Amino acid sequence: LSTLSLAIPAVGIGMAVQDTGTPYVVFVILALLCGLGGGAFASSMANIGFFFPKAQKGNALALNAGFGNLGVSVLQFTAPLVTGIALFTPLFGAPQTYLENGVQHQVWLQNAGFVWVPFILAAAVAAWVGMNDIASAKASFADQAVIFKRKHNWLMCWLYIGTFGSFIGFAAGFPLLMKGQFPDVDPSKYVFFGPLVGALARPVGGWLSD
């Protein structure tokens, strides 16, 4: 269900970017809904450790996190490709136009959201049918709420905000940095390399921790 819920912001973003009059608050709400994916990612990090012995937990966590971070690179690689073609026209909106050096260009920004919907639906069906849930790991909210009283939990949360939050921030800022420092270079062709290197490096950290 958490995977399926990601279809809401994917469709919402595809609709919102077609109207230049869309209020900023709408994009804030859509961004918050995208956080449902972050919640699924966090739960998978807690879940994957049950499938590996203690001596391999670091590598398991790193591989799982690396695959999650890889999504940033996949998005930055895919979005420039799909927004440049009439992938869903005329079903899901007309292209937007802009002028560059006196030449009119067309772009389909909505494709960056709509393109993920089939994959989200397929993943949701696969999870519903074949996910290996761990019955012994179930606990009530009261059982889980004990973590709020543990100082190490707060320390690790703060540390995680600094590390994973920095990764997301650097991935978002990299295109702007390239555009500002190298104005003659098209950043859309290279920005995916930044998060790609970060994602591929995570398994190394897991191996070292083991």
Locate the predicted segments by residue.
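Juxtamembrane intracellular "pre-TM" segments in multi-pass secondary transporters
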Residues: N132-C157
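C-terminal ends and interior cores of transmembrane alpha-helices
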Residues: L4-T20
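Glycine-rich segments within core transmembrane alpha-helices of 12-TM secondary carriers
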Residues: G38, G58-G84
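Helix-to-loop junctions at the C-terminal end of transmembrane segments
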Residues: L1, A201-D210
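C-terminal membrane-cytosol helix-exit motif in multi-pass small-molecule transporters
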Residues: G84, V117-A137
